[in-house]
Amino acid sequence: MSRRRPAPESSPRHDGADAPPEPHVPVLLAEVVEALGTEGGTAVDGTFGAGGYTRALLAADPALQVVAIDRDPTAIAGGQALVAESGGRLRLLPGRFGDLDGLLAEAGIAQVDRVVLDIGVSSMQLDAPERGFSFRSDGPLDMRMACDGPSAADLVNEADETVLADIIYHFGEERRSRAVARTILEARRRGRIETTAQLAELVAGVVRTEPGSHIHPATRTFQGLRIAVNDELGELVRALHAAERVLRPGGRLAVVTFHSLEDRIVKQFFAARSGRSAQGSRHLPGGPVETVRSFRPVTKGPVLPGEAETARNPRARSAKLRAAERTESDVPEPLAALTALASLPDAARGHRR
């Protein structure tokens, strides 16, 4: 698998907020198929979307059965044509990929041979103004992948200033999060903030564009709110542990991420589960903890898109693929440190402006 030096990371997944509308193009497609292998059995596409990875897996291995999961009802409806084309080799399950082991159990499937996860928001969601993910086109401030639960508008109009600042700082990595939160509170005293254009304009008034940058000043704020609304990092942590439980020995897990928060979680999960990170300390009661190696690496570090792919699809430029193979070890306890990475810290202080 080819690797290259990473381009500077500039935005959330697929970077669709400030790029012209494009059809959804699966990223690192050949590399994902190669990492997963093609030897029959059952594969799970935990983030079906437009079906790019599912379609490629079905084409690469005529003996493969695929179970695809998505919490977005639009994606499930759009995938019915592919189900019909698959000749009984594809099943679509509505639900969250963090619950993939439970969804598979309900479908009568105990173990699988491959799992692929493509993390974050899809191009289809970004490019639909009515979904409220993007500031490129005005629309309702929604951002919900599953179309239920509190929306971004609910969060923006009801959360207190500290919570908003912490979300924007930790999930959006926006250094001006306090100023953004303060501006939001001042604006909502005059009336509810209901649209993406309203919010983008408010943020642009306090976040300066760096010289030479093409990144919209609201990019990081929108990322932070979207991650919070959909609990994206928590879903990722649950999905990694769920995949660990359902993969047979020799089964493979491939994960594509699009920003540093996601990649950090995947990297630490694979490092811990393959024995490449400390599991204990001689300074703690009981001393070092014996490592249970439930995975062995398939990729050596992240696999990155090449220049040809990023030229065809600029939204791929921040993508990273990591993959590992399940060993015969029993499933260890979930990693509490990953849950902490996916959550707002109890005290987030000192660095926001």
From Swiss-Prot:
GO BP field: rRNA base methylation
Under the heading Pfam families, the entry gives: Methyltransf_5 (PF01795)
> Which reaction(s) does the protein catalyse, per the Swiss-Prot or TrEMBL entry?
cytidine(1402) in 16S rRNA + S-adenosyl-L-methionine = N(4)-methylcytidine(1402) in 16S rRNA + S-adenosyl-L-homocysteine + H(+)
Highest taxon of the lineage: Bacteria
Q: EC top class, in one word?
A: transferase
Cellular component annotations (GO), alphabetically ordered: cytoplasm
> Where is this protein primarily located?
cytoplasm
Q: What is its EC number?
A: 2.1.1.199
Q: What Gene Ontology terms describe what this protein does at the molecular function level? A: rRNA (cytosine-N4-)-methyltransferase activity
**Residues that bind S-adenosyl-L-methionine, according to the entry?**
G51, G52, Y53, D70, F97, D118, Q125
**Annotated stretches, region: Disordered:** 1-23, 276-334
Where it sits in the cell: the answer is: Cytoplasm
Keywords recorded for this protein, A-Z? Cytoplasm, Methyltransferase, rRNA processing, S-adenosyl-L-methionine, Transferase
Instruction: Tell me the protein family, please.
Output: Belongs to the methyltransferase superfamily. RsmH family.
| HAMAP family given in the database record | 16SrRNA_methyltr_H
Instruction: Report the function annotation for this chain.
Output: Specifically methylates the N4 position of cytidine in position 1402 (C1402) of 16S rRNA.
What name goes with this protein?
Ribosomal RNA small subunit methyltransferase H
Lineage of source species: Bacteria, Pseudomonadati, Pseudomonadota, Alphaproteobacteria, Hyphomicrobiales
In the UniProt record, the gene name given for this protein reads: rsmH
